[in-house]
Every structure is written in structure tokens, then in C-alpha cells.
Amino acid sequence: MSGGGVFTDILAAAGRIFEVMVEGHWETVGMLFDSLGKGTMRINRNAYGNLGGGGGSLRGSSPEVSGFAVPTKAVESKFAK
């Protein structure tokens, strides 16, 4: 402490605590937005892999299907009236 008195020392300590809290919160918010952006990019690549030329680079992508679902049974029979 700077030796300016008890009140000044308490205010200086409170200022340092506030600064650490603000820095920690900004770091946490930054990491949250970073992971949110990465997750959104991953979802978009998986959902729309055939757009933008990045579909073949995805792990587990099939060149025959390339992101399109093929029905394996007749869906019309479920909804026919």
C-alpha cells in the first residue's frame, strides 16, 4: 500500500479487486463468444457442407450422398388419409 491512510488503502484494494473482476469477466465473455462462434461454424459446416466447397473435407462425408438424406422407407404411408 502507498501509506496514505486506512481509507485510501481500502479504496486502493477495492479498486484492484474490481479491476481483477472486470478483467476476469471480459476474459470469460470473450471465451464464451469464441466458443459460440466456433460451434456455429461447426454446425454450419455439418449442416451445409455441400455449400462453399467444404463438404468433401468433412470427416465421415460420403461422396455419393454429400449431405443429402435419402429416405429408406415410404413416408407417404404414414401421412396418408
Swiss-Prot record:
GO terms for molecular function: bacteriochlorophyll binding; metal ion binding. InterPro entries: Bchl_c-bd, Bchl_C-bd_sf. It is found in: Chlorosome, Chlorosome envelope. Its main location: other. GO terms for biological process: photosynthesis. A bacteriochlorophyll c binds at H25. Pfam families: Bac_chlorC. GO terms for cellular component: chlorosome envelope. Keywords: Bacteriochlorophyll, Chlorophyll, Chlorosome, Chromophore, Electron transport, Magnesium, Metal-binding, Photosynthesis, Transport. It comes from the Bacteria. Component of the photosynthetic apparatus. The light harvesting B740 complex binds bacteriochlorophyll c. Belongs to the BChl C/E-binding protein family. This is Bacteriochlorophyll c-binding protein. The lineage of its organism: Bacteria, Pseudomonadati, Chlorobiota, Chlorobiia, Chlorobiales.
